[in-house]
């Protein structure tokens, strides 16, 4: 199902008439802190995070595009079982290291399977990137195949940056 979803996103992305305006980007996200303020379990013993925050170092690059900064992520909806299966919806603010007024603000929808995470992320640019949008996928390397969890919380990002579409044109 996930593969079909990503194939459909790719087809829509690359067959769009605005394809020439899109810049393919890639990069990395490394979590630097994770704080849970309040959580509870439901009748199925799944964990719900009412308030959790993650900070990360972000690097996104391509020919003609670059962004390096920090991410502040609020986990707005998190439902996880004891096997690492679940769903997380986040609100994100990415701030540039060189200019705090340059930001990307957006959200992500993530699926977890046995602790391995796949997300689709959408952002709107501010400051230097005013009028731009960014759409990314976030894929965690499968560390769930081994018993020892030595994942450094380093995630690969891939996607596009493009002009924000204008409705009615």
Predicted regions and their residues:
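Sec-dependent N-terminal signal peptides
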Residues: 4-14
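Beta-strand-enriched cores of mature, soluble protein domains
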Residues: 21-169
């Amino acid at each position: 199902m996930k593969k079909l979803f990503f194939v459909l996103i790719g087809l829509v992305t690359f067959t769009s008439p605005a394809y020439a305006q899109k810049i393919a980007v890639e990069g990395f996200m490394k979590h630097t802190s994770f704080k849970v303020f309040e959580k509870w379990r439901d009748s199925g013993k799944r964990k719900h995070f009412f308030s959790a925050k993650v900070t990360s170092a972000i690097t996104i690059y391509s020919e003609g595009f670059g962004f390096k900064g920090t991410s502040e992520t609020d986990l707005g909806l998190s439902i996880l079982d004891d096997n690492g299966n679940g769903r997380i919806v986040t609100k994100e603010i990415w701030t540039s290291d060189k200019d705090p007024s340059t930001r990307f603000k957006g959200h992500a929808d993530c699926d977890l399977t046995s602790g391995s995470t796949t997300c689709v992320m959408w952002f709107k640019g501010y400051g230097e990137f005013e009028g731009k949008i960014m759409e990314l996928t976030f894929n965690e390397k499968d560390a769930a195949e081994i018993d020892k969890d030595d994942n450094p919380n380093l995630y690969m990002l891939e996607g596009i940056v493009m002009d924000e579409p204008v409705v009615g044109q």
